[in-house]
C-alpha cells in the first residue's frame, strides 16, 4: 500500500469533504466528478496546502499529514504550467534540482535528459513563449520527473488542450511516471480522460468513493454520477 487517506475530513468556507482512499504502489487513479465537487481539495490536502479537520494521510507506514508541503513525498502538476518566461526551457526544468540562476552542467544535462523523455529533445534552449501549449505541458512534466517524488498528482494540467492532446498527455504520464513505479492521482471532469486510469474514484458533493474498476464506473453509473454523465 502506497497512499492511504483514513477518515479524512476537510472543512473550508462552509464546504465539507469526506474521503477514504487506499492506493497501491504504481497505481494510476482518476478522481472524476463535476467542477466544485472537491477533487482538487483532495489533492491539496495530500500535498499539504489545506489542513485536515480530522483523519490521517499516510504514505506507506508513515503519517505525512503533519509534514510541511516541501517534506511530503509529493509532486503536483497544476493547471498553470508555472514556467518562468525569462528562463529557457532547460533552466525551467532544472529548477527541480536547484534554484541557482545558472544551473550546473550536470543539472542542465539531467534537465535535457528529462526533456528528451517527454518528447522535447533539443528544445532546452527555447524560451517558454515559443512553445505550443502541448509542448509547455511536456516541459512542466519534465520538471516533475526531475523532482523524483514517488507520488505525482495532476490537477487538470492539460485542461487547456484539446481532447486528443489531453489523452496523449495522460498516456505519456502513464508511460514516464507509471513506468518508473510512481503512483499517480489525476483530476478530471471528463469520463473519456478518466477511462485511461487503472481505477476511478467518483467525487460528487464533497464525498469520494473508493477506487473502482473503470468499466464498473463508466459502463453502469449510478446515483449522482449517472445524472452527471447524462446516462
Regions found by a protein language model. Name each.
Residues 47:
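Helix-to-loop junction immediately C-terminal to a conserved catalytic motif
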Residues 63-78, 99, 105, 217-221:
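ABC ATPase NBD coupling module
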Residues 87-96:
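Short coil-to-helix segment of the ABC ATPase nucleotide-binding domain corresponding to the Q-loop/switch region
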Residues 105-123, 174-175:
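Conserved ABC ATPase "signature" region
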Residues 127-131, 135:
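Conserved ABC ATPase signature
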